[in-house]
């Protein structure tokens, strides 16, 4: 099952995400980089979920006063320039949540930005991303799996 309009040719396996949220008993979720809020709305059917996206005025609120237990960040990091990833991941880390769920594309998008650059600015292999996540979240367990048919990786991070 998927959600949204298939933006950048990835579809989310909602069963896997739902299982992750269930296993880690997620109640308060932040959808970091929520875009138009499709996943936020979907998750609000079963959880309390807030959407944050600095590029979308409607969702440009980091909700720092809320005690989230889980952050989901799907199809976001590949859109961030490599030089800005450390700052972004450290911002995510500063929420001090128990569990995090990322999906990251490992291929270039079909879509170009108005200036001609590819929409996916940081396209790296699984091991590169794994090292970045393990370095940033060194106090947690990091599991990275590759979904080659979708040209993406799934990253699960939780307390040791």
Annotate each predicted stretch with a short phrase.
Residues 97-107:
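Conserved beta-strand signature within the Rossmann-like core of class I S-adenosyl-L-methionine
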Residues 76-79:
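Hydrophobic adenine-recognition pocket in adenosine-nucleotide-binding enzymes
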Residues 109-116:
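A short acidic, helix-capping loop that chelates divalent metal ions and anchors anionic groups
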Residues 1-68, 86-90, 95, 116-132, ...:
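Conserved N-terminal segment of class I S-adenosyl-L-methionine
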Residues 56, 107-109:
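Short, glycine/serine-rich, charged loops/turns that create anion-binding
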Residues 72:
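A conserved beta-strand element that flanks and buttresses the S-adenosyl-L-methionine
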């Amino acid at each position: 099952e998927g959600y949204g309009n298939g933006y950048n040719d990835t579809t989310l396996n909602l069963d896997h995400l739902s299982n992750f949220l269930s296993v880690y008993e997620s109640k308060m979720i932040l959808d970091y980089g929520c875009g138009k809020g499709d996943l936020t709305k979907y998750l609000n059917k079963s959880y309390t979920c807030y959407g944050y996206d600095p590029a979308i005025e409607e969702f440009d609120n980091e909700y720092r006063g809320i005690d989230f237990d889980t952050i989901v960040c799907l199809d976001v990091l590949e859109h961030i320039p490599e030089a800005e990833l450390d700052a972004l991941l450290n911002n995510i880390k500063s929420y001090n949540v128990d569990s995090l769920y990322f999906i990251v594309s490992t291929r270039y998008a079909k879509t170009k930005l108005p200036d001609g650059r590819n929409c996916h600015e940081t396209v790296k292999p699984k091991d590169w991303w794994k090292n970045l996540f393990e370095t940033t979240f060194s106090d947690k367990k990091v599991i990275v799996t590759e979904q080659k048919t979708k040209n993406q990786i799934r990253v699960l991070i939780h307390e040791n």
